Amino acid sequence: RLYYLRNGARISVSAASKLXSNMMYQYRGMGLSMGSMICGWDKKGPGLYYVDENGTRLSGNMFSTGSGNTYAYGVMDSGHRYDLSIEEAYDLGRRAIVHATHRD
């Protein structure tokens, strides 16, 4: 909201992730443990970013964070296709979360 008031436009997904990345960079080395996914839709289309406690910022199509992420990646890697329907994508996401929480 503050960005909109200052700039007269909505913040892009890329700019929002850069803002979080810059904030986290200031706290690097302080023992924080954080991994965050920032996603949204702007003028450029859909955007997905991963930001961690060191301010590392990655753009990608698929991310998993947290202690069970290796289990989730196993499910996602085996079932991911670029032509997934919305229903198939939701099902894949649900299965990845179930496996990650069950195994973790």
Swiss-Prot record:
EC class: hydrolase
Key words, A-Z: Cytoplasm, Differentiation, Hydrolase, Immunity, Nucleus, Protease, Proteasome, Threonine protease, Zymogen
InterPro entries (UniProt xref): Ntn_hydrolases_N, Pept_T1A_subB, Proteasome_sua/b, Proteasome_suB-type
GO molecular function, a single term: threonine-type endopeptidase activity
Catalytic activity: Cleavage of peptide bonds with very broad specificity
Protein location: Cytoplasm; Nucleus
GO annotation terms (biological process): fat cell differentiation; immune system process; proteolysis involved in protein catabolic process
Cellular component aspect of the GO annotation: cytoplasm; nucleus; proteasome core complex; proteasome core complex, beta-subunit complex; spermatoproteasome complex
PANTHER family in alphabetical order: METALLOPROTEASE TLDD, PROTEASOME SUBUNIT BETA
Role played: The proteasome is a multicatalytic proteinase complex which is characterized by its ability to cleave peptides with Arg, Phe, Tyr, Leu, and Glu adjacent to the leaving group at neutral or slightly basic pH. The proteasome has an ATP-dependent proteolytic activity. This subunit is involved in antigen processing to generate class I binding peptides. May participate in the generation of spliced peptides resulting from the ligation of two separate proteasomal cleavage products that are not contiguous in the parental protein. Required for adipocyte differentiation.
Quaternary organization: The 26S proteasome consists of a 20S proteasome core and two 19S regulatory subunits. The 20S proteasome core is composed of 28 subunits that are arranged in four stacked rings, resulting in a barrel-shaped structure. The two end rings are each formed by seven alpha subunits, and the two central rings are each formed by seven beta subunits. The catalytic chamber with the active sites is on the inside of the barrel. Component of the immunoproteasome, where it displaces the equivalent housekeeping subunit PSMB5.
Name of the protein: Proteasome subunit beta type-8
Gene name linked to the record: PSMB8
